[in-house]
Amino acid sequence: QRFLGAIGYAHGFFNLEFFYDDHDDCLRVIECNPRLASQFSDLYERVHGVDAHAMALTLALGADPQSLPRVRPTARAAASLVYRAFDANGDVPPAPAVPQREALARRFPDALLFSFAKMGRGRARDFRWTGSHRYGIVHLGGRDREDLRQRCEDASELLGWPAPYLDHGSLPARVHASAPSLSSLGEPSVEASAG
């Protein structure tokens, strides 16, 4: 809120990207984009029952987004899990095979899975530009934070991917993270993800 007030941002969607430095327990803002981060749009619907894209359009047209209909929320907490490899010389977990994808869909019907398997120059470019390779994203909802955490860990295990927030010795001291917010509607119960 202090940051948004300092830049004069009063309402609307924004995407705040920051670094967390565990050496001094400090957040450092990288950038603030005054727009909807589309990666997170389904999380708002899961938790608040709002269509974030319709809200953004309504705001752009100068209308009140509170007048839009809401759907019944399906979760009290939601997360966008971003799976990254930080060792350019290490192994990257393979993309889930069809049986794993089908098992994920059966066990977690609300899951959204994005797989970004890259090899060779594509992966090398990721490491050169970002210091990591994003090989997947999973969106899930849960009854509460604990249920969400358990579902995230179970889904990660099913896919053969380490849960991104657990210490596997592969995360750098600084972890890039981003989280969605609706400044005019209050904070959603959406988890920021190591991403």
How should each PLM-predicted stretch be described?
Residues 11, 22-27:
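Coil-to-beta-strand transition motifs
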Residues 1-16, 33-94:
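Active-site "cap" helix and flanking loop/linker of ATP-utilizing ligase/carboxylase catalytic domains
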Residues 23, 37-39, 143:
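Short coil/turn motifs at secondary-structure junctions
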Residues 25-35:
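A short beta-strand motif that forms the metal-chelation/ATP-contact edge
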Residues 17-21:
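Conserved protein-kinase catalytic-loop segment immediately C-terminal to the catalytic Asp
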Residues 57-195:
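Peripheral (often C-terminal) accessory segments that flank ATP-dependent C-N-forming ligase machineries
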